[in-house]
């Protein structure tokens, strides 16, 4: 019986560590994509400004709207992410994982997977809107 309990503890710890490592990997992927997109924010602003300088292109132009939607989706992502994961809690504070149960780690993992999908969606909006705006600019130059 003693061996069964020891085996259970080892498996449980192993699973917790696996979830923790998965969470860290997801978290790092999300942060890298976030940082890359933050660098693109300037490009969105520049493309929008250049488009608005063209006669006949107004704020209600589809390309302008898409650039605004992309920018706002990033703002919403950052707000939602920071509301969900404060700096003093896991996974922002990686040291706190020792105090978490497997179910808590799993919940964090599920939330991180949702945020990964969300930041991927933001990235798609950035790519599509910048490409569309740049095509208009390239056609005029």
Q: Which functions belong to the PLM regions below?
A:
Residues 9-12:
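C-terminal motif of bacterial Sec signal peptides marking the signal peptidase cleavage site
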Residues 15, 39, 76, 82-83, ...:
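Generic detector of well-ordered secondary structure
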Residues 6, 18, 79:
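Residue-level marker of positions within ordered structural domains that often coincide
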